[in-house]
Amino acid sequence: GGFGSKIYHYAEEAIVTWAAGKLRRPVKWTAERSESFLSDAQARDHVTHVELGLDDNAKFVALKVSNIANLGGYLSTFSTGIPIYLFGTFCVGPYTTPAIYVETKAVFTNTVPVDAYRGASAPEATFLVERIVDLAADELGMDPAELRRRNFIPADAFPYQTPVALQYDSGDYQTTLRMALEAADYAGFEARRREAASRGKLRGIGIATYIYACIMAPSAVAGALGARAGLFESAEVRVHPTGSVTVLTGSHAHGQGHETTFAQLVADGLGVPIEQIEIVHGDTNKIAFGMGTYGSRSLAVGGTAIVKAMDKVVAKGKKIAAHQLEASEADIEFKDGQFTVAGTDRSKALGEIALTAYVPHNFPHDELEPGLDETAFYDPKNFTFPSGAHIAEVEIDPETGRLEIVKFTASDDFGRIINPMIVE
């Protein structure tokens, strides 16, 4: 994580580019650790006052937030958009609060500038919302888990339009919380608290639920923030005459495992062995457009662009297969790397179709150009909204102040997971 800090255009990048041009050779500059702390964009310096209103049934009716946000010494790329726009939208959380008022005063100080960095305003918004929910539960004498359950957006209410711009696409917050409570043995906590007290220790348990907006991608959002940029992603899928595949993606990998996950997408989609798939990224001489890796967007946006390009490859392959198999295009099915005439055993492998595309002796020239190489762009209309519930159980020695995290439980809904090992 933390790749949002790479969005910002640092002065050193411009100087290194200039130096490389002057010297006509590669130039590399790397900040030392102390230099990074003094110059990299950072995040989360807020002073916040929050009020939560509830009715007689312990239902949330209003949330009011007054916030002072430190922007640092000068503006960065998305500086004000993070502690103002995104912070305000994340104050909804997973709850049905009908009225939300957020006022943020942004101030300049003598610190480094702020930008998107590890959550881009979601951690601080989640902290204040979950903290005030706990305070409300304590004041009402309610179980904090029950107060949350009572105010969650119902699973059958999606898509759910929040009062602060965002429309949530899906979610099942009751289930993620229930799973976390069961895994943490929440019901048995009081017995563990008494046992800790018998040893002279203090034991506490805390719950936090969250919503996050992944895939920083809808270009309309960039426009709303005043950024003159598109946030789409591009992909090119090139099937070679041998049947091997090269994918050129604008989502640059630097430790996320794109080479594995993107190759897995292609292997599943085209029925090609994973060892015959090459993933190319980070080369501006080969890749026309790329918006990058940040904002939890690579698989959902970059991966979807790859899927859309594969769909075009399959669509063209069906036309070629229909011509070769003397069948209607509507009767051609594609599965596991084979183009088959529906209801028959007549088929052509993807490799055969690719070879025909590049050696087009028996080819529908009136309908198609030779080659099997397709490009796609993907600009989603909305974010995706993963969610979850985390529970921490801690023990404190009141004599020394030493704190021990006895158990930490997390239940997260990430939607469809392509590669579980990378998630782990």
Task: Please provide the spans of the model-predicted regions.
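Cofactor-binding beta-sheet edge motifs in enzyme active sites
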Residues: 2-175, 179-424
